[in-house]
């Protein structure tokens, strides 16, 4: 006589919590699976709404220094308030973020100062 699905459900329904825990562990070992909850995938249309919102925080990235390295270092010092050595290290390490998480106006102002000094700047 074969065991039916209903027989299995009745047997599982009659088990205690400890017995069910042991059963789950046995299934995991026997079949190489995990009973951990799986992450739910986002709905396909959900990403469009987030992209439509206006970005409020921007990162000012120094992409290239250009020919006027001294002028760019001065601009970085003015924008960030860093010391001479720290500003020079930042400029030498380009591409690097000069300002992060700033509003649109501050990002535009920093970009203008850096570009006026001869640097190539990205705002993301």
From Swiss-Prot:
Q: Which GO terms describe its molecular function?
A: mRNA binding; structural constituent of ribosome
User: What keywords are assigned to this protein?
Assistant: Ribonucleoprotein, Ribosomal protein
Q: Name one GO biological process term.
A: translation
Positions the record marks as coiled coil are none
A Pfam family: Ribosomal_L12
Q: Known CDD domains for this protein?
A: Ribosomal_L7_L12 (cd00387)
One GO CC annotation? cytosolic large ribosomal subunit
Q: What does this protein do?
A: Forms part of the ribosomal stalk which helps the ribosome interact with GTP-bound translation factors. Is thus essential for accurate translation.
Binding partners and assembly: Homodimer. Part of the ribosomal stalk of the 50S ribosomal subunit. Forms a multimeric L10(L12)X complex, where L10 forms an elongated spine to which 2 to 4 L12 dimers bind in a sequential fashion. Binds GTP-bound translation factors.
Similarity section? Belongs to the bacterial ribosomal protein bL12 family.
Q: What is this protein called?
A: Large ribosomal subunit protein bL12
* Organism of provenance: Cupriavidus pinatubonensis (strain JMP 134 / LMG 1197) (Cupriavidus necator (strain JMP 134))
Read off the lineage from the record. Bacteria, Pseudomonadati, Pseudomonadota, Betaproteobacteria, Burkholderiales
């Amino acid at each position: 006589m074969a065991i039916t699905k209903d027989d299995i459900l009745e047997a599982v329904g009659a088990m205690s919590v400890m017995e069910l825990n042991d059963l789950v562990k046995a299934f995991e070992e026997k079949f190489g699976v995990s009973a951990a909850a799986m992450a739910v995938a986002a709905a396909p249309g959900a990403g469009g709404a987030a992209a439509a919102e206006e970005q409020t925080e921007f990162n000012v990235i120094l992409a290239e220094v250009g020919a006027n390295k001294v002028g760019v270092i001065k601009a970085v010092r003015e924008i960030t308030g860093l010391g001479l050595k720290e500003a020079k290290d930042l400029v030498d390490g380009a591409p690097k973020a000069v300002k992060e998480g700033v509003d649109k106006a501050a990002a535009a102002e920093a970009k203008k100062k850096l570009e006026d000094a001869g640097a190539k700047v990205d705002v993301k």
